[in-house]
Amino acid sequence: MRILQLLFAIVVILLLQDAPARGFSDSQLCRNNHGHCRRLCFHMESWAGSCMNGRLRCCRFSTKQPFSNPKHSVLHTAEQDPSPSLGGT
């Protein structure tokens, strides 16, 4: 009888050990890649995957500026400006 109890305990322990056999969870992988699990990413973050089995997003700080406008950041000269000139030719 004691052997059956011991075998039952071993089987239960083995059944509960399947999570580490699958590898890291997606939340742990997100943290390892310098990300944060959030419901929505902030405007300076990019979506880099999922967390909590797809319920949350893995957000990482992006190096790109998401709201930059190239027209206002670069000065255009008359040669680069594609708009027609108002002066006569």
UniProtKB/Swiss-Prot annotation:
What is a biological process (GO) this protein takes part in? Answer: defense response to Gram-negative bacterium
Specify where the region named Disordered lies, as residue ranges: 66-89
Please name the GO terms that the record assigns under molecular function: CCR6 chemokine receptor binding
Q: In what tissue types does this protein appear?
A: Expressed in the liver, gall bladder, kidney, small intestine, spleen, testis, ovary and male and female reproductive tracts. Not detected in the ovarian stroma and the theca and granulosa layers of the ovarian follicle.
Its cellular-component GO annotations read: extracellular space
Q: Where in the cell is it found?
A: Secreted; Cytoplasmic granule
**Does the keyword field hold Oxidoreductase?**
no
- Family annotation (CDD domains): BDD_Gal13
Q: Which InterPro entries match?
A: Defensin_beta-like
UniProt keyword annotations, A-Z? Antibiotic, Antimicrobial, Defensin, Disulfide bond, Secreted, Signal
Q: Where is the signal peptide?
A: 1-23
Query: What intrachain disulfides are recorded?
Result: 30-58, 37-51, 41-59
Which PANTHER family is this protein grouped with?
BETA-DEFENSIN 1, BETA-DEFENSIN-RELATED
Query: Could you tell me what this protein does?
Result: Has bactericidal activity. Potent activity against E.coli, L.monocytogenes, S.typhimurium and S.pyogenes but mot against S.aureus. Has bactericidal activity.
Q: Which family does it belong to?
A: Belongs to the beta-defensin family.
Q: What's the name of the protein?
A: Gallinacin-13
